[in-house]
Each structure stands twice: as C-alpha cells, then as structure tokens.
C-alpha cells in the first residue's frame, strides 16, 4: 500500500458518523499529493511512445508530481509554465523541488495554459493536462485498489478540481466489482460540476478548474455511484480544523484547506441526513 489509510474513530464520533471513517493520506505520497498517482503514469506512458519533453501549466501539486517524476529519469525534460503573479512562496517551492535540475525549466508567462497547449500543438513537448487526457485516469485505479481493501466501503469524498480522480476511482472500483458512492467536494470559487448560483472566495486554492471539461463523465460517475456534489465554505473548513484540534489530532489539524475539503463535505452530508450503509473514506489530497 502506497499511502496509509487509518481509521479515524474520534473524528467520526465528532462528526456524528456511526458507520466508520477512514482518512486516505495522499498528502503522504512520495510525490507530495494525490497527483503522484496520475502524473508519473502519464509521463511513463508517453515516454514509451517516444516523448522526451513534457510541459505543464501548474503552480501546485501537479507541477510537484511532474518534477519528482522527471527527476527520476535523466533522459526527460520538463517545462513548467506559471503566471506572472504566482505567489512567491509557490514559486520558491517549485524551484526548491527541482533542485537546480537543468532539464526542469520554470517559466513565468502571461497565459500558462495557452503556452503549454501551443507547445504541445507544435510537437515540442507533451502537455500533461488532466482535465482532457484520459490517460490521467489510469493512475487513480491503483488508488481504488487500495481503498477496496476497506470492508464494506460505502462512500468516498473527494476534493475536486478537474474531476479526473473521481472518474479514475470510479473506473478502478468497477474493476473490483465495487460501487461505493462517489462524492465530489468543491468551493464557492470553483464548482463547474455543481449547478449552483453560489460564488465567493475560498481558502482551498487548489480547486481551480472552472471550465469543467469532464462534466459529462463526472456527472455520470455521481449518478451511477449514487453520490453527489457538495459546495463547502471556508467557515466549514475552519470548523473541521478546529474539531481536529479539539480531539487532539494535532497532525491532521495542520492539513491544508484543500485536504480538509473532503472532511467538510462529509460533515455537510451528515448534516443533510445523507445515509451510508458502511465505512466512509475522506481523501486527504495534499497542499
């Protein structure tokens, strides 16, 4: 098993969940987050097809996963495109992770997504874009295999940006003849898969894909699994972190707002009297 999935009995009690709760600690993945399930698989697949140069538009978890994967193969190179106004701490984080590797180029541009798209279009580098590339789903099937070890698993709550992990997990569970509820959790700032007039800022700043190109597939996943989408506000995220402190789960209390999103989504479901007939998993995704 690549990452731990401990049972969280005290947190389940604090939330009022009686069927059992597990936390999947993807924040402890060797590549830093759940993106380590998918990005390296994409790189490995495309390198076998002859691609040696890769590019990505990301300033967070996806970029970090790509950096770690590229550093493991001296024959590959990576271009990371970030915006002109990227927070200084994020830029320094990427530079630190790259470790001065000359085959990893971090470039600030006006339009990161379009720059990566054009580089791919010209055949100069393969764009690692999870929002449109179905090879991004493959790596999450292994994650589904680990979660499948939880007996009578009833539901999974997923902080969701592009929707790739939700779809990939659903596909993986089918291979294990399982169909737990898939619940996605988004923010007021970004919820393309959830039809709602709600808008506003959010501390969960890794949820950024406002276009929702996977909408059809994600909505099918929710319908077929019996899950749904939830929009979580900052106040709910902070409430979860306070609960973690109150029950002396100090390590978990320091998880990012992005990671706390899944637990806050579960808390909202419980308040809305959502029914579970077995244990629930909340994905702790990373930064």
Predicted regions and their residues:
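Positively charged, low-complexity intrinsically disordered leader regions
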Residues: 1-52
């Amino acid at each position: 098993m690549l990452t731990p999935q401990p049972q969280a009995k005290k947190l389940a009690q604090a939330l009022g969940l009686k069927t059992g709760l597990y936390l999947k600690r993807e924040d402890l993945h060797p590549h830093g987050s759940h993106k380590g399930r998918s990005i390296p698989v994409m790189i490995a697949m495309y390198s076998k097809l002859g691609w040696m140069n890769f590019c990505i538009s990301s300033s967070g978890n996806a970029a970090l996963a790509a950096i770690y994967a590229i550093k493991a193969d001296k024959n590959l190179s990576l271009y990371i495109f970030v915006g002109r106004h990227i927070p200084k701490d994020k830029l320094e984080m990427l530079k630190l992770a790259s470790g001065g590797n000359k085959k990893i180029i971090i470039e600030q541009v006006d339009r990161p997504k379009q720059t990566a798209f054009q580089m791919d279009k010209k055949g100069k580098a393969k764009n690692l874009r999870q929002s449109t590339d179905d090879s991004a789903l493959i790596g999450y099937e292994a994650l589904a295999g680990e979660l499948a070890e939880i007996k009578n698993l009833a539901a999974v709550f997923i902080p969701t940006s592009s929707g790739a992990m939700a779809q990939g997990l659903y596909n993986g569970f089918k291979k294990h003849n399982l169909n737990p509820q898939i619940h996605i959790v988004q923010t007021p700032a970004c919820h393309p898969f959830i039809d709602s007039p709600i808008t506003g800022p959010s501390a969960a700043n890794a949820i950024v894909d406002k276009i929702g190109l996977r909408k059809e597939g994600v909505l099918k996943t929710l319908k077929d699994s019996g899950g749904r989408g939830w929009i979580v506000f900052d106040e709910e995220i902070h409430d979860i972190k306070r609960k973690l402190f109150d029950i002396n789960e100090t390590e978990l209390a320091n998880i990012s707002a992005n990671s706390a999103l899944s637990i806050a989504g579960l808390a909202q479901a419980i308040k809305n009297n959502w029914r579970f007939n077995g244990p629930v998993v909340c994905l702790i995704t990373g930064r």
